[in-house]
Amino acid sequence: MTMLISLPTAPSVPNYQSLERPLNFTMAAAAKVRELIQEENNADLALRVYIQGGGCSGFQYGFEFDENRADDDLALETDGVVLLVDPLSLQYLLGAEVDYTESLTGAKFVIRNPNAKTTCGCGSSFSV
């Protein structure tokens, strides 16, 4: 017996070089990244945002510091701080905003993604 599993199709690979600003990296996010990079004492670091399978809605966001930039990475600079996104992740993030928020419940990086059809209550998982 053969079982077929249907996976959601990814949006077409974007030509992000033709877009003026494929996603928004806010001043608040850049300021927090700068602070964290200074704590690491490594000026070569950039914040990498990526999408991976998982979470309760199918996909989840990931953040990490990275010294390495691939040739096909999108590199956005805000106030001297670099945000890196690989092409596969970018197709799910076009038009999104990467921000940093502080509230009584805590502080965190957030992604406001217009491509997400549903999001998890935690805010780190979504579906397309």
Curated annotation (Swiss-Prot):
This is Iron-sulfur cluster insertion protein ErpA. NCBIfam families: iron-sulfur cluster assembly accessory protein, PRK13623.1. The keyword Iron applies. Keywords: Iron, Iron-sulfur, Metal-binding. InterPro entries: FeS_biogenesis, FeS_cluster_insertion, FeS_cluster_insertion_CS, FeS_cluster_insertion_RrpA, HesB-like_dom_sf. Its cofactor is iron-sulfur cluster. Gene3D superfamilies: HesB-like domain. Binds 1 iron-sulfur cluster per subunit. Transmembrane segments: none annotated. Required for insertion of 4Fe-4S clusters for at least IspG.
